[in-house]
From Swiss-Prot:
It is found in: Cytoplasm. It comes from Neisseria gonorrhoeae (strain ATCC 700825 / FA 1090). Keywords: Chaperone, Cytoplasm, Disulfide bond, Redox-active center, Zinc. Under oxidizing conditions two disulfide bonds are formed involving the reactive cysteines. Under reducing conditions zinc is bound to the reactive cysteines and the protein is inactive. This is 33 kDa chaperonin. Redox regulated molecular chaperone. Protects both thermally unfolding and oxidatively damaged proteins from irreversible aggregation. Plays an important role in the bacterial defense system toward oxidative stress. GO terms for cellular component: cytoplasm. GO terms for molecular function: protein folding chaperone; unfolded protein binding.
Amino acid sequence: MNQTAINRADARTRFIFDDMPVRGLHVRLENVWHHIVKQKNYPAAIRCALGELLAAGVLLSGNLKNEGTLIVQVQGQGKLKMLVAEATSDRTVRATARWDETAEIADDESLGDLLGGNGVFVLTLQPKDGEPWQGVVPLEGGSIAQMLVNYMKRSEQLDTHIALSASDEAAGGLLVQRLPEEVLDEEAWEHVSTLARTLTAEELAELDAQHVLYRLFHETPPRVFEPETFESSCTCSRGKVSDMLLMLGGEEVGGVVAEQGSIEVDCDFCHSKYVFDETDVNALFGEDVVGVAKGLPRHTVQ
């Protein structure tokens, strides 16, 4: 496979209609998706939902105005506890899920049944410079796509159509939206959104942007921009784990190491393991926190 083919397998493509105030984004992730699903043995229903949320995160990150990270989460109280996907302005992504691994999950189990009651959708913006912003709303809708449409109607008050799909081979998404502060004939918007709704889940997962946009809009073709390529990359590091341990405090961390000999932290996304033994922990806190936990006199370490 040549580099162009690889790139187009993991790309977000912007488009806009010159004759009406409507913009759109198409995303298809293939190699990135393969890398993510290899990290865990996801049940089929959860794998599908995670792929849809991943595609949604890449779509929504297309509207990032500043450098940073967009995080989308779905949290529930059923068999599925959490789905999370992250997309950065550097065009890297990662995603994972947490669920009750003792529960039986049917391949066709619905998102609502997986999440149980009182689910929430969380969208977080973490700019490289500045304070993070977070929005939390109750889950509304029977699918991730419908949930996002409801969220965007509430937050942006813009007519939006979102379609999401995930298969074993790829995750895909399509977003079509009115431009803000522009007048659009209702019949024109209805025409565009109706065409967008004819796209099947199979087509969305299988076809690249060129074929999707021709399939939908060949009679009134939009202006299409150069694809933006994405790759899978985890942002975990030993330094970030150290910061987390410092936040927990020397008493708690020292107690764990005194009892177990070390403390191990696994990354939920890429499964990297970070192990801190007695020497590591004492150096991190600048004192013999493990010794204190064992009942020895407190003293600093170099």
